[in-house]
Amino acid sequence: WTKLRAFELYEYERVVMIDSDMLMCHNMDELFDRPLERGMIAAALACTCNPKQIPTYPAEWTPRNCGYALRPHPPNDTRQLTKPTHRLINSGVVVLEPSQEQHDKIHTFILQHPERVAQYRFPDQDLLADVYSERVQMLPWHYNALKTLRQCHPDLWNDDEVRIIHYILDKPWLLGPAPCGGHTHLHSLWWNAYASLAAHPATLGMTRDEWAKEVALHVRGI
């Protein structure tokens, strides 16, 4: 639940929460100015296609139930969201406005629904989907470009539109730079970015020794 403490950053009017397994491709500052009603969050849908057929995923996670199959995307009318899976979000990118009210709302839900919370497969995003079930503004896919979307929904994906890539499932830094099946292109983008930063760690305010200890030590295949 640590990442949900972003709702406690009361000194900020708005926060864009981003997971660490992502690669920024283009500026996303417009998310700080995007209209958002009080008490709402903004996030992209979860892809429920389960292309690797992971047996521990919910049984309803199938391509026919995936919200990304809906057109237009994102849906203009919430009446299109006819299945529970259509309202699931991926919490890789969440636009939120921190407040005591929102923090208490989340905390209260956890305390009042312990059995449901215990069944969550993806705790933080399942919780947010429940708490904000009618208060989510759906972001376009490119603000949280799940790498599997490129294969699961090729009609939706456009490389030029991607703002940030989300390396769900297998991580390029754990697999090494070798080709990775259908994800080779997206993984190579991460490795290119890594190589650029590794060559000039001073751009991050790091010495080469600091880079080796804090970053390179955790990357395989180099």
Model-derived segments and their meaning:
Residues 1-222:
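Glycosyltransferase catalytic domains, chiefly GT-A lineage
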